[in-house]
């Protein structure tokens, strides 16, 4: 009898939650327009994220039940289709009060098409994280124990993640991490075994959904932060991620005490302050050297658009960039001939590579003989970073101030200190 009662209760709760998971978006709605009334948090730089907190007594309380409904609404704008939404998340605290909030919202939104919506019960204590920079951010926010599975383990430069992954299969190990395979084709069985409360991954244009992951009925957090063009805009997303998790350790069991939200807010404030300080200092110097990034891939040479994150970083470093007048916020696919025609006189060439020893000039010429036409090549002003050993992506994605400092040093010399990532 007890089992039957529990089964019925489970079905009822699932039904209430399912009412919030409506899969159709109303065309033409913007994130701001579709947000429910509440206290909208100011986002100074992020353009794709809207966060609305609900908890005002007059707005959400039910006098008859004596319930003060508390929840947070996070709306992600579609980066690839202006004026539409990619996803909505309703963050509801765990516990009895949260259960009542789930039921209340299910009643309120029982009709009407809405953007794809997931209810996320917080704090999330078990998650599969497909993206290395987000793993690093979780360590910085103090909620790393919520990482229970990762993808692309070989490409993650976080020693403790490697250490915990080595404990996978050890039943006596505390908080091991499971290797869930490639992010492009994750091991579904391993993810199911993790019993995650959320999955963090990077969305892509025209991806057509997430296949078997969609069928797990686990909230998929579409981390579209990388589509922000502003460096500080991407970093500001940590305010949202901080709301999902709790601090590790034995913090007092109050919502504010266990949440990573205050840590995320203070971390972003520190990053913003340092970034703006560096930008102001760089602006006080004469225009710096010209910088070319990346190298040829096949028959294409991908370079940052003028309004991309890297393009803006170069501008804020007061460096010269051959595509600084370009208006694109993404990458530009150029032919090597186009790059050489426009950037032959570039002063500094900086690029990333994965694995092995730094590439010598001889090796670079074996890759493409045209490199010798670059002034930076003939002068030996070549800077490289090995992303297989240096946590470049892990650290710079949410710490644009670190990359800004690198570009300032490349453009203006070592008056700002020594390079941390790039090596000559």
List each model region and its residues.
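Positively charged n-region of N-terminal signal peptides that target proteins for export
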Residues: 3-9
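Sec-dependent N-terminal signal peptides
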Residues: 9-18
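N-terminal ligand-binding lobe of clamshell/alpha-beta domains
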Residues: 26-424
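C-terminal motif of bacterial Sec signal peptides marking the signal peptidase cleavage site
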Residues: 21-24
């Amino acid at each position: 009898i007890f089992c039957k009662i529990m089964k019925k209760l489970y079905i009822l709760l699932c039904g209430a939650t399912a009412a919030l998971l409506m899969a159709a978006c109303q065309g033409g709605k913007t994130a701001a327009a579709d947000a429910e009334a509440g206290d909208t948090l100011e986002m100074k730089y992020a353009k794709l994220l809207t966060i609305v907190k609900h908890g005002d007594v007059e707005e959400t309380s039910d006098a008859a039940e004596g319930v003060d409904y508390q929840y947070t609404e996070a709306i992600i704008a579609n980066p690839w289709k202006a004026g539409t939404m990619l996803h909505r998340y309703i963050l509801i605290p765990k516990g009895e009060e949260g259960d009542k909030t789930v039921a209340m919202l299910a009643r309120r939104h029982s009709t009407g098409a809405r953007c794809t919506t997931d209810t996320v019960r917080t704090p999330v204590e078990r998650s599969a994280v497909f993206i290395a920079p987000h793993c690093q951010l979780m360590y910085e926010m103090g909620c790393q124990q919520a990482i229970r599975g990762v993808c692309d383990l070989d490409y993650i430069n976080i020693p403790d993640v490697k250490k915990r992954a080595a404990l996978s299969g050890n039943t006596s190990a505390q908080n091991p991490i499971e290797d869930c395979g490639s992010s492009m084709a994750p091991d579904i069985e391993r993810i199911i075994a993790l019993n995650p409360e959320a999955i963090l991954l990077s969305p892509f244009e025209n991806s057509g959904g997430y296949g078997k992951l969609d069928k797990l009925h686990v909230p998929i957090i579409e981390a579209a932060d990388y589509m922000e063009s502003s460096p500080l805009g991407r970093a500001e997303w940590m305010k949202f991620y901080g709301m999902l998790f709790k601090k590790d350790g034995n913090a007092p069991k109050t919502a504010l005490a266990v949440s990573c939200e205050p840590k995320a807010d203070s971390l972003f404030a520190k990053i913003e302050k340092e970034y703006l300080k560096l930008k102001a200092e760089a602006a006080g110097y004469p225009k710096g050297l010209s910088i070319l990034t990346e190298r040829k891939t096949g028959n294409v040479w991908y370079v940052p658009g003028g309004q991309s994150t890297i393009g803006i970083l170069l501008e804020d470093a007061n460096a010269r960039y051959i595509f600084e007048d370009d208006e694109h916020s993404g990458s530009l696919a150029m032919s090597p001939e186009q790059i050489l025609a426009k950037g032959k006189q570039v002063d500094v060439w900086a690029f990333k590579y994965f694995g092995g020893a730094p590439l010598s000039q001889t090796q670079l010429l074996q890759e493409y003989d045209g490199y010798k036409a670059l002034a930076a090549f003939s002068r030996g002003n070549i800077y490289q970073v090995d992303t297989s050993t240096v946590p470049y992506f892990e650290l710079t994605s949410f710490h644009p101030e670190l990359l800004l400092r690198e570009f300032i040093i490349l453009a203006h010399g070592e008056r700002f200190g020594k390079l941390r990532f790039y090596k000559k």
